[in-house]
């Protein structure tokens, strides 16, 4: 397709056929590597078993009686890079463990017209409207400052719809300039070298311990969808839209499989580099930022429980008996 050897109509027919597989199409027709390498830091094949979730979520679904919340994490891109938002549903069990489910991945700023930080802020605020998250994590190093500056302002979209400003709960540089009455749901993350090492280590630990669940593969989702009357009656556009979160999850897995441990002078630091330098890592960055903040929230939850109940934070009061 790159050299004009494949007809575009033929390619589109392939992609809409019942037997279409994103992975096989990428390998056979686009010469794109998929899968893992012996150098990969993450075990691609092992992680596949955590792809259990059949349906993505497009808005908040708060289940009665459950202790859950949503969290959105954003890795900011500009010009040639993508801005990626990962949407997590976090369920807290009786022991205080925070189990994460990646229910959607949104790529913002797909075209040149939507790459402005004003438009990206509107897109993030639409996600806030839909998912009512407890927090929105933004990497405020470098380019992220541009998005952060817009998030504390109000905007109107092309239809005249109003989007309210939000405020940072943890970044002192914004305290004096952000609206005093704006909801403080923004969390600024300044990912420098030492912190990045911890973020990578946390992502590895939570993934290998099975504390994260993902959407099933797009081919499985497509087969399930096409077995229903609703799926069969869907337009091609609606079908692609429905399956897109599954494809984005596969791309996240491919990005993780493309990361290897970089040799550094400091053996205690975890520094990851791309095996194929042309392959992006923005989805992984957004994903890892979210997992890091979930870990911090879990630790804060455990500390509060220990202060309240004593003991190990499992919600059971520790009693002392005297004789």
Residue ranges of model-derived segments:
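ASCE P-loop NTPase helicase motor core
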Residues: 1-14, 145-171
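Nucleic-acid-processing active sites and adjacent nucleic-acid-binding tracks
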Residues: 61, 81, 87-138
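A structural signal for short, well-ordered beta-strand segments and their strand-loop junctions
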Residues: 137-139, 214-215
């Amino acid at each position: 397709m790159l050299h004009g050897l494949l007809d575009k109509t033929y390619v589109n027919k392939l992609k809409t056929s019942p037997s279409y597989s994103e992975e096989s199409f990428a390998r056979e027709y686009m010469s794109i590597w998929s899968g893992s390498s012996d150098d990969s830091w993450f075990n691609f094949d092992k992680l596949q078993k955590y792809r259990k979730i059949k349906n993505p979520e497009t808005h908040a679904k708060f289940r009665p009686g459950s202790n859950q919340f949503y969290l959105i994490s954003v890795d900011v891109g500009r010009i040639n890079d993508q801005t990626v938002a990962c949407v997590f549903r976090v369920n807290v069990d009786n022991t205080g463990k925070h189990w994460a489910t990646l229910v959607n991945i949104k790529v913002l700023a797909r075209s040149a017209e939507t790459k402005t930080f004003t438009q990206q802020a509107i897109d993030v605020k639409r996600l806030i409207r839909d998912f009512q998250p407890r927090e929105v994590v933004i990497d405020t190093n470098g380019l992220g400052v541009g998005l952060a500056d817009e998030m504390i302002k109000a905007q109107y979209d092309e239809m005249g719809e109003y989007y309210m400003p939000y405020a940072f709960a943890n970044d002192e540089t914004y305290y004096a300039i952000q609206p005093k009455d704006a909801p403080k749901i923004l969390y600024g993350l300044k990912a420098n070298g030492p912190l990045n090492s911890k973020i990578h280590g946390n992502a590895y630990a939570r993934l290998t311990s099975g504390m994260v669940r993902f959407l099933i593969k797009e081919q499985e989702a497509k087969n399930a969808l096409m077995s229903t009357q609703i799926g069969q009656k869907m337009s091609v556009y609606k079908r692609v839209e429905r399956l897109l979160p599954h494809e984005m999850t596969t791309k996240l897995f491919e990005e993780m499989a493309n990361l290897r441990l970089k040799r550094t002078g400091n053996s205690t630091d975890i520094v990851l580099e791309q095996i194929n330098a042309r392959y992006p890592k923005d989805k992984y960055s957004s994903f890892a930022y979210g997992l890091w903040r979930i870990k911090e929230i879990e630790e804060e939850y455990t500390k509060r429980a220990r202060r309240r109940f004593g003991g190990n934070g499992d919600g059971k009061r520790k009693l002392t008996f005297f004789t």
